[in-house]
Amino acid sequence: MDAKIMITSPTTWPSPAKLNLFLYINGRTDNGYHELQTLFQFLDHGDQLTITVNDSGHITLTPDIVDLPVEQNLIWKAANALKKKTGCTLGANIHLNKILPMGGGIGGGSSNAATALVALNFLWQLGLSDDELADIGLKLGADVPVFVRGHAAFAEGVGEKLTPAQPEEKWYLVVRPDVHIATVDIFTHPDLTRNTPKRSLETLLDSEYGNDCEKIVRMIHPKVDKQLSWLLQYAPSRLTGTGSCVFAEFNSRSEAESILAQLSDNVSAFVAQGRNISPLKETLADYLSAQNRPI
């Protein structure tokens, strides 16, 4: 991109949620990490980052998040990791419109980090490839590369082997029970299934989807168990990741919204459609197209 047309006005970027449509644990590596097979799909629902580039050399992030110092925020970490990698001397003001629940298993923090990397790579005109951005992202979190690449993906190994996938783009009712689940507590639980046989993506896509973490989470957290039991009355429903969010799948928006309407007002929930191309990827394409438009 020509530096003479650097965008200095605010730009807004989506930071979409994701679901693990299935999650199977196949074993452990020699260094203790769990080997798994999982299918990521994005949702057309999520946070937003509004970014204004400047020449201050500093990253500012608003608003403040309770109990999360800015230096620990993945957005701030991503922006500064990008500066360190490239030697970029520019800065940015980043405003986060936080919609997704924190710690819900739908990728909020990882998605935020990926959006910061993709957006600032464009706005600062750095020219890094998806592979280079994904490498930076992997140091911030295992799920960040999926969001950077922007395609629904089948993940294997410890999550680092990604194969683009095309699952059906269904409608989902996503519900967040009011509990905090520490991923480490689930993956270290003695009763966690760790020996599910590996299967090909084709076989998995044609099979009933499941989540090996779900049994443990339901056992430890009655609120999750109660919410899943309720959803299962209406549609196929599962845990995403290690939770706490659970989701039910439907063939239409109207079906999902009719069940959403039956939830009490104090339950955190939303309806969204699965997307195999991330809204972030689509927004980047729009900005790139606008830059190439004849003036």
Swiss-Prot record:
Provenance organism: Vibrio vulnificus (strain YJ016)
One BP annotation, GO: isopentenyl diphosphate biosynthetic process, methylerythritol 4-phosphate pathway
Keyword match Aminoacyl-tRNA synthetase: no
Catalytic activity, EC: 2.7.1.148
Gene3D superfamilies registered for this protein in UniProt: 3.30.230.10, GHMP kinase, C-terminal domain (3.30.70.890)
Pfam family, one: GHMP_kinases_C
Name the UniProt record assigns to this protein: 4-diphosphocytidyl-2-C-methyl-D-erythritol kinase
Top EC class, one word: transferase
Pathway: Isoprenoid biosynthesis; isopentenyl diphosphate biosynthesis via DXP pathway; isopentenyl diphosphate from 1-deoxy-D-xylulose 5-phosphate: step 3/6
Catalytic activity: 4-CDP-2-C-methyl-D-erythritol + ATP = 4-CDP-2-C-methyl-D-erythritol 2-phosphate + ADP + H(+)
GO molecular function terms noted in the UniProt entry: 4-(cytidine 5'-diphospho)-2-C-methyl-D-erythritol kinase activity; ATP binding
InterPro entries on file: GHMP_kinase_C_dom (IPR013750), GHMP_kinase_C_sf (IPR036554), GHMP_kinase_N_dom (IPR006204), IspE (IPR004424), Ribosomal_Su5_D2-typ_SF (IPR020568), Ribsml_uS5_D2-typ_fold_subgr (IPR014721)
Active-site residue list: K18, D143
Function: Catalyzes the phosphorylation of the position 2 hydroxy group of 4-diphosphocytidyl-2C-methyl-D-erythritol.
Gene that this polypeptide is encoded by: ispE
UniProt keyword annotations, A-Z: ATP-binding, Isoprene biosynthesis, Kinase, Nucleotide-binding, Transferase
Domain of life: Bacteria
Similarity section: Belongs to the GHMP kinase family. IspE subfamily.
Binding site for ATP: P101, M102, G103, G104, G105, I106, G107, G108, G109, S110, S111
Claim: ATP-binding is one of the keywords in the record: yes
